[in-house]
């Protein structure tokens, strides 16, 4: 079968999506005697499609190139977040019509991956210099699936914190390498009939391909954090469209923000914070960190 021939080709070190030629002779035995035929045959194996060098869990995948934020310096390449076996994702800024590539080191061998004219993810063979481009500059979420040899691009627009009570919005700036943030942020909470001391539920919103999605907590109704709460409290999970806006929300930490006196029906934090969203591989998951502004500057 073709699959059996492909397996033989792999043993012969033939690369995927190439042709390889195997030569053969017949060796005959009779007791202790043996003879090798003078005639030689050969057959060509058409190797199946695929990626030869699949990175393991401990072999990171990066995006690099003139079209990326590292300007072609592989030492500054942005690591992609491993989502699952063979699946990697990154949020990054790309330049229109400028080349980039995906790379990894697999069993000590530097490997590069690109997308062909048919949109198929492939591994570059020795001597090849294929790259990837996008037609429009912008911030993208890029997801590659090496097992299925696919790639997807999502254009990212505004990113902001959103208080459900009062509909208050705080926009974030793109900081580079998959990070968004705001400095000297003054948190606020608004009183409600069920929350006389103020409703603090909030989440983060992101425009993806023109549609606004929420990023929230993994639990539907998580309680309020304090100063000893583990940082994983603010790990970010993309929520399905149509999810109730109050569910899977975060809550502010009263001990950190130290609310002032009520002004009208709103409380304002007396401690300003620097808030950073990490949509990259820095912490092994997408997450948010809040620091008092003075501490963040130190």
Task: Please name every model-derived segment.
Residues 294-298:
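A short, hydrophobic C-terminal helix/tail in secreted or cell-surface proteins
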Residues 1-293:
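Insoluble glucan recognition modules
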């Amino acid at each position: 079968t073709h699959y059996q021939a492909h397996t033989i080709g792999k043993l012969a070190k033939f690369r995927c999506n190439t042709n390889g030629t195997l030569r053969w002779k017949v060796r005959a035995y009779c007791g202790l005697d043996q003879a090798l035929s003078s005639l030689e045959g050969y057959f060509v194996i058409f190797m199946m499609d695929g990626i030869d060098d699949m990175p393991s869990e401990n072999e990171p995948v990066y995006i690099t190139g003139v079209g990326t934020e590292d300007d072609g310096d592989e030492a500054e390449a942005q690591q992609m977040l491993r989502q699952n076996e063979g699946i990697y994702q990154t949020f990054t800024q790309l330049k229109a019509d400028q080349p980039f590539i995906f790379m990894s080191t697999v069993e000590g061998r530097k490997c590069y991956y690109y997308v062909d004219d048919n949109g198929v993810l492939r591994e570059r063979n020795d001597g090849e210099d294929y790259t990837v481009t996008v037609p429009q500059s912008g911030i993208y979420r890029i997801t590659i699936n090496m097992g299925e040899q696919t790639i997807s691009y999502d254009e990212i627009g505004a990113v902001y914190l959103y208080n459900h009570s009062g509909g208050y919005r705080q926009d974030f700036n793109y900081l580079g390498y998959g990070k968004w943030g705001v400095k000297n942020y003054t948190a606020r909470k608004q009183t409600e009939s069920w929350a006389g001391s103020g409703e603090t539920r909030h989440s983060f919103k992101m425009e993806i391909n023109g549609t606004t999605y929420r990023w929230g907590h993994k639990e539907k109704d998580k309680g309020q954090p304090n100063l000893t709460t583990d940082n994983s409290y603010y790990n970010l999970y993309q929520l399905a469209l149509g999810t109730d806006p109050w569910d899977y929300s975060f809550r502010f930490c009263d001990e950190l923000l130290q609310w002032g006196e009520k002004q009208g029906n709103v409380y304002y934090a007396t401690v300003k914070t620097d808030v950073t969203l990490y949509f990259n591989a820095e912490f092994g998951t997408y997450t948010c960190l809040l620091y008092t502004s003075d501490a963040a500057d130190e």
